Amino acid sequence: MRLSKSQGILPLAHAVLAAAIAYSTAATAADYRLEAEDFTNVGGTYNDGQPQKISVYTVNGITAINYVNKGDYAEYTLSVPQAGQYDLTYFAGTAIDGARIDFQVNNNGSWQTLARTDVPNAGWDNFQPLPAGSIHLSSGSQQIRLFGGGDHDWQWNLDKMELAYIDDSSSSSGGGSTSSSSSGGSSSSSGSGSSSSGGSPEEGGHVSGTFKLEAESAHHVGGEIDTYAINGGVAVNYFNSGDYLEYNLHLDQSGLYRPKYYVSTAHSSGVAVGLMATDHEGALVTKNTSEVQSQGGWDSFYLLNAASDINLFSGDLTIRIYGAGTQDFQFNIDYVIFERISDVDLDLDGDSDGIADVNDSCPGTDPSETANSEGCAPSQLDTDKDGIADNRDQCPTTAPGDFVDSEGCASTGADDDDLDGIANQEDQCPDTPFGENVAPSGCTGFEDSDSDGIANGTDQCPSTPAKEFTNESGCSPSQVANPHSVKVTVNANIKHSVKGISDFGRNRHITAHTTIYEKDWEGHADKLNYLVNTLDVTLGRDNGTATWKFQDTKEDPNRENWPDLDYMVTRGKELRENYEANPFYKRFSADRTELIAGTNPHPTYPTLSWNANGSTWHDWQPMHIETSAAWMGQYLKHYYANSSNGYIGDPMPKFWEVINEPDMEMKTGKFMVTNQEAIWEYHNLVAQEIRSKLGNEAPLIGGMTWGQHDFYRRDGISRYADNAYDQWIVADDPAEEAAAEEFFRQAMATTVDDTRDQNWYQWDVMWKGFMDAAGHNMDFYSVHVYDWPGVNSDAKSTLRRNGHLPAMLDMIEWYDVYQNGQANRKPIVISEYGAVQGGWNTLAHQPRFESEVLKSFNAMLMQILERPDYVIKSMPFTPAKPLWGYYPGGCGYEEVRNCTAPYHYSLLIEPVLNSDNWQWSDYIKFYELWADIDGTRVDSVSSDPDVQVQSYVNNNELFIIINNLETVDTTIDLTVAGLNNAQLQNVELRNMHFDNNFDTQLERHHMKQMPTKVTLAADATLVLRYTLNSTIAINQSVDEKKYFGNSVSGGSVPHRISVAGGAKNLQVNNVSVPSGYAESQLRLTVALYPSQDDTPDSLLQIDTLTINGHTIETPIDWRGRKENSVERYFNTLEIPVPVDVLQKNNTISVDFRHNGELTVANLVIKEYTTTPVRH
């Protein structure tokens, strides 16, 4: 099997081929024939009741062996007159799936697998010729073993095998069993015997004296490499910087060794071979790096002596050879020889730092540095244990417990230490007490004639009336002609509850999409401390850890493409203990690190990608969703703290999302070969595996984190046809090619995608389909939602922060309740929200790229807070330092970065790209704006749906948050009631707005009297913090209840109707109508043809609405800005309804002005224990 390189596609992974290929039945001319019954020995492990592990029988005049079970084997002695390549053919039969023959050779006492061959299910006695590829055999007497290597208990019957001599070099395929291997897995068993020397020792094999390791026979591989035939043998190419080959051996006797590499390169500089090996204490350490010089090109090999001799110690020995130079492409390598020179030299000093290796605490010291008596140089030490190496530490005696900056000096990590609105670098008075207004210098005591907090020298409105907050120019609402005015009323004594939930939920919603253990925070401990401990932000979310730990998982030695579950126990313990031993992590409380975790599609999910991202570092990949689900259960049990391991290590995630945004990669150029049904079933399997492993200690499990969130639209992503991969699959045997093509087609095939190009696909299939198939196994539904600002301006923005997000949530909630009842409703986790724009990816960073995101953060959070019972966790998308997203791809991790564009969505940015000078982005202002807000939600209302308001009381403080969804400055007429006898001491105003250059401004002002007016700028957010002299008494309540309407279609799927053609009748039943004061609202979730909002002649209006025969006046202004750039106007229309028209069972008639669809009709009633103040 091969793939056409002219199409730029890497060779297909052996693991993928295994599931795809049915082998040719063409006969092979035999030079040697070995009858199966002529074995010299048999063995095995499976007890099948026979006298011995393998039996002999006769059928159709043929004598053959049978009762070969998994783990059984037959051994033969073969006299090979001439070394060379041989084509191997079996005459075997089986009646089951999952049978495989492993061809093994005894190599110095160790059995080495040269070929693995799947046996097709064609009948036990149907002995058709089965080509098994080519193998290399040495001359002389050879011990051969045929091993039952498949995953079924029963394996195969065998008549005979034939060997046909090819020549004395490797085959045209590059050697080994490339065309017949089914593992593609760890390279210890993927045709490694094809090298010119007959191969390397198998994993764990014994070596002594001088020994040779073939490059293509590495037991484990890191990175993305390939093999090719050259000079009568096989070598490794595509060896990049950081790639490695690893061998796990057992050395019989210690000794001093001289490594020699047979290598080539076409580069004149920047190429080096790095060598790591286990030391006398069993630790894997760097031994040396050796520069590789070009001898004329990639195929001009030469023998390179390593830069120094090394000691190798007896016992278990790991050797790792890696690309250590600066060039992306490093070298090709054929083999390495370890020449034993003498016994161990205990005086050997491999890094030439003056300390013998056996006494050297820091091997690999840079020659340019001077080591201490323990062999450690400043770059290898951190004397004050502040996380900054001594050679970079400008404050080398930091006190224990201090958080430090990138130079090792104690720092708060803040950009405005005294929170006076003046950045540290501009603040001439850095310790201003809270409650004081400051001048632009950051100092108090300035002249301010009208006491508005704006210095006379910059005050453009010098006679501001009392009780009015001003804007940045010193002008209050009554001094400027704001085009719009809105009344906001707060009743601080009335608790607002939804299904019993009334708290702000700071740890649920003031969160950041990062973790304390990310390398992004190395050198920025002060900033992490500021974010988490000072601003009281809860972390985080993590998909990357599971990704690399899956890549790190070894293959089960007895089951191809299956994780080694025993290895996971050991490896998990090692990593948990590493976490437990890190004192830095203990400086952050557990309630500040409540984790949402999960996995990315590659390589955890069986994407079948033949690119490097589809496989593990050990060169195996999952082929079935059952494999990945089994790994997931084992991973959570053994890699996280729980009762089974004494609660040692990483805290168990609170939430587990099964897979992150698979729709963005499924059937696209990102190479994810799968279908909707498989992903749904995968969620079921993962949930079952995790719960079976952890029981009631399992995290809450959820999905589907779709990347698309326009329920009314068709699929927004172009996808490959089911036969798309045919063009890249090429085989010499037409049968092989056809089988491989069919395998990929079946993996892509689906029964639910006929409507991909039709409206409502994203709901009918992607969301509803998932809920129907896997909802019963989910603890929560996981949602992502983003605005898409225009590339160059706001004119072409597609916004979901209007009524779009409420519409999404109402549809999910209604259908869940309709199917399962209110008692079984699943909550929502919004694990990503914000704004993104693909058109920015290659552009230089601009302030607007941050301000547009902040608008979305604030508006979406305000909507999330309206549903405290339903959205149990939310998280803005705020990666810390996402070098993985820098452009062009991969540049962020180069030794010398030369990126042309950053990833624009991050907490930390470089003002100058590639400078490594990391500063807070404006994202930190989001957390500064929301700092300290906590407490009990209290009654607050706005007279305009485009002005959002939420209010919370926390002891003696009242927080009022107001956000503007519109693009015009608005006067807020503010009324605060219910403070009883508490006396005001201070009101702090935090004002986040955006100037004409799109810079984000966060200003702070203070007032000692109750404000009555304040300007809310376009897209701005205000926080008013009232401090009183005593606790605010919350002595009344309002209870909000939602009553779910009947199916708008009368119960017929898909539960939506066209609104064209006259009035539509709806029903909301079983309503408990309050007898006291109450307020109610009809909520209609619609997708209408777009039109301008908030105008009498808008196509978005309702012509008539009646409830139980009563005509209801409907608004002309819906939630969200007047101008919108959307394909459909997707919104939940919120219509005030007099409570006295409601009954237990309510008949609703609604006639829309124009066309579209209606999906959900609900009633919301707020029942008060007292009559609230209304402005």
From Swiss-Prot:
Activity and stability are strongly enhanced by CaCl(2). Activity is not affected by sulfhydryl inhibitors such as iodoacetoamide and p-chloromercuribenzoate or by thiol reagents such as dithiothreitol and 2-mercaptoethanol. Strongly inhibited by N-bromosuccinimide and sodium dodecyl sulfate. Transmembrane segments: none annotated. Residues 382-393 have a biased composition (Basic and acidic residues). It comes from the Bacteria. Recombinant agarase was produced extracellularly using B.subtilis as a host. The amino acid sequence of the recombinant enzyme expressed in B.subtilis starts with amino acid Gln-479 and ends with His-1175, probably due to proteolytic cleavage. Endo-type beta-agarase, which degrades agarose and agarose oligosaccharides more polymerized than hexamers to yield neoagarohexaose (NA6) as the main product, with lesser amounts of neoagarotetraose (NA4) and neoagarobiose (NA2). This is Beta-agarase AgaO. It comes from Microbulbifer thermotolerans. The lineage of its organism: Bacteria, Pseudomonadati, Pseudomonadota, Gammaproteobacteria, Cellvibrionales.
